[in-house]
């Protein structure tokens, strides 16, 4: 299988070594999340040895995906700290439109970006990155439905299945999930190998 990929700033010399990887990934959830965009990367990351903590507005609440698949929240977003995680996973669906209004979601997303930790977002998840104002001058992709929003927020929008610009990893739709999850796992493996080198 061949993929069209835009890669920027991912050479070994450009990578920053992050202190003490926790082997933990934070994922956001709320009602009407895109089922596959949460579960596919979550399962892949767990297969590779990462613990994925799914945080929603309320701990213990069971959130329903667009297709009805349930996801209980392991934690409350407002209690999460960037320092406790290696990366941020933001699935799409319509949940990001609600989550972007939560100051804790915006602050956490900015904190991951400021600490140069991977932020993997797909489909409508770009809405959260827009509200966090982390896309200005950066290459990224999304579902075509929010292309104008992304561009108006200063992103250099690229119509490709995977776009990596430094710590930002983005894909368009569920059809791009294989390459999306593979890229996030590869980035985390690189970070892990740099830490142990």
Locations of regions flagged by a protein language model:
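Extended, subdomain-level signal for the structured scaffold at the beginning of enzyme domains
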Residues: 3-115, 119, 128-137, 147-197
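Short, thiol/selenol-centered motifs that function as redox-active sites or metal-ligating centers
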Residues: 122-124
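Anionic-ligand binding patches
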Residues: 140
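Active-site-adjacent substrate-recognition loops and nearby beta-strands
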Residues: 143
């Amino acid at each position: 299988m061949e993929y069209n990929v835009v890669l920027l700033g991912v050479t070994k010399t450009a990578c920053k070594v992050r202190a003490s990887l926790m082997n933990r990934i934070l994922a956001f959830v709320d009602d009407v999340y895109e089922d596959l965009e949460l579960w596919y990367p979550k399962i892949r990351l767990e297969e590779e040895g990462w613990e994925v903590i799914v945080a929603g507005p309320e701990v213990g609440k069971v959130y329903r995906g667009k297709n009805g698949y349930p996801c209980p929240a392991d934690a409350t977003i407002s209690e999460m700290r960037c320092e406790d995680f290696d990366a941020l996973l933001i699935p799409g669906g319509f949940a990001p439109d609600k989550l972007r209004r939560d100051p804790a979601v915006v602050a956490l997303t900015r904190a991951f970006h400021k600490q140069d930790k991977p932020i993997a977002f797909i489909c409508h998840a770009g809405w959260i990155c827009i509200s966090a104002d982390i896309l200005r001058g950066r290459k990224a992709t999304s579902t075509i439905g929010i292309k104008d929003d992304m561009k108006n927020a200063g992103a250099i929008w690229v119509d490709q299945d995977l776009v990596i610009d430094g710590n930002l990893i983005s894909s368009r739709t569920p059809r791009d999930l294989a390459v999306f999850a593979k890229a996030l796992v590869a980035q985390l493996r690189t970070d892990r190998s740099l830490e142990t080198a």
